[in-house]
Amino acid sequence: MLDLKMIRNHVEDVKAKLATRGVKPEAIDDLLAKDNERRELIVKSENLKKLRNEVSDQISQLKRNKEDANDKIQEMRKVSQDIKGLDEQLENIAEEVESKAAHLPNLPHEDVPVSLTEEGSVEQRRNGTPRTFDFTPKAHWEIGEELGILDFERAAKVAGSRFVYYVGDGARLERAVYNFFLDQNNAAGFTEEITPYMVNDASMFGTGQFPKFKETHAGYEVKDEGLTLIPTAEVPLVNYYRDEIIDEEKLPISVTALSPAFRSEAGSAGRDTRGLIRMHQFNKVEMVKIAKPEQSWNELEKLTTHAETLLQKLGLPYRVITLTTGDMSFTAAKTYDLEVWIPAQDKYREISSCSNCTDFQARRAHIRFRDENGKLQYVHTLNGSGLAVGRTVAAILENYQNEDGTVNVPEALVPYMQGTTVIGKK
């Protein structure tokens, strides 16, 4: 949530920055008009409450003097009714103001490339050289199906499209990957959590998924329960601190969690219809940092660097790009995408997004800290995948495949596979 006071004081700057994210200036004008109406009602209500107090004092004085107070009593009743009516209007308008403000995305950082589409993202660096094959590399779903370690057909029978069964060494590889990620994250100072996989509406609002997810049907809601299956562990990890004041000395906080992620993939018809790239349910290891404002940009670089080390230790070629203003998530002020090389597609595909959300989520979730001067401030929140597990499995199957259909296990994962170095058909 953007600070209304900041919007009022920097209207044209806010309009210009949000225009790079596709927000029309009328949206800001509508918000401020409604906010002005709310503020005018507050003044009227406060004036009437002041008048009510004055009339009440006059009634008391008349009664002490044993004089007739009926006219003043009638006046006070009318004032009280007017106050009640104004307060009801105020409540309705306050909801409208919050709703309009809740639909505005975060302001982009000044060095984010400006574009309303993904075109224009800036590549920062690459690591590793994509392998040159002396045979035509197969897609990961072909490899998995031929080895009997991925079963999309039975998953479709049981649940529908965009689901998968991991079988045998496929399940072991998936487990090896996420245990490796969690161990690396723990070693880097992240505190591991096991979170709820369903959250309430306030939590989804706090991290910025609602109201957009409700309107676009991007998630899975549990009917009549007020719960939603999490699209990422970012939601419960950040909301752990919702409505709390954190001790300053505890900042920055780094937490991590493995969880399933549930996505309806609304609007993705025809895209990545095969394989592990775009699923309705997939495992993901998430990383979240909560920091003081002056720490957050350095923490974003550290978060991104750590995500890179995971790919480096797995020997997977990747690149890092800075997303454009129009391609970032709703809550982000700046995002680095890590894209891993997928040989069968002959291109890099996203495997992690590392974002600084500044105080945007903290305002929605009311997460604050008290600074050294005793002043309450909003924290900054950051998040990043560390990493998407299914996409990592896909990248391993494709980058480590052999001509005979077998797959070599990355050296870092061999201990997690109980010494298995090659996955073959059984």
Curated annotation (Swiss-Prot):
Q: Where does ATP bind?
A: R263, S264, E265, E350, I351, S352, S353
Root EC class: ligase
Is the keyword Aminoacyl-tRNA synthetase assigned to this protein? yes
| CC terms in the record's Gene Ontology section | cytoplasm
Q: Where in the cell is it found?
A: Cytoplasm
Q: Name the reaction it catalyses.
A: tRNA(Ser) + L-serine + ATP = L-seryl-tRNA(Ser) + AMP + diphosphate + H(+); tRNA(Sec) + L-serine + ATP = L-seryl-tRNA(Sec) + AMP + diphosphate + H(+)
According to the UniProt entry, its GO molecular function terms are:
ATP binding; catalytic activity, acting on a protein; serine-tRNA ligase activity; transferase activity
One short Pfam family name for this protein? tRNA-synt_2b
Quote the EC number.
Answer: 6.1.1.11
- Gene3D superfamilies according to UniProt: Bira Bifunctional Protein, Domain 2 (3.30.930.10), Serine-tRNA synthetase, tRNA binding domain (1.10.287.40)
Q: Give binding positions for L-serine.
A: T232, A233, E234, E286, S385
Q: InterPro entries given for it?
A: aa-tRNA-synt_IIb (IPR002314), aa-tRNA-synth_II (IPR006195), aa-tRNA-synth_II/BPL/LPL (IPR045864), Ser-tRNA-ligase_type_1 (IPR002317), Ser-tRNA-synth_1_N (IPR015866), SerRS_1_N_sf (IPR042103), SerRS_core (IPR033729), tRNA-bd_arm (IPR010978)
Per the record, the similarity remark reads: Belongs to the class-II aminoacyl-tRNA synthetase family. Type-1 seryl-tRNA synthetase subfamily.
Role noted for this protein: Catalyzes the attachment of serine to tRNA(Ser). Is also able to aminoacylate tRNA(Sec) with serine, to form the misacylated tRNA L-seryl-tRNA(Sec), which will be further converted into selenocysteinyl-tRNA(Sec).
Instruction: Note the NCBIfam families from the entry.
Output: serS
What is the protein name stated in its UniProt record? Serine--tRNA ligase
Q: Which gene encodes it?
A: serS
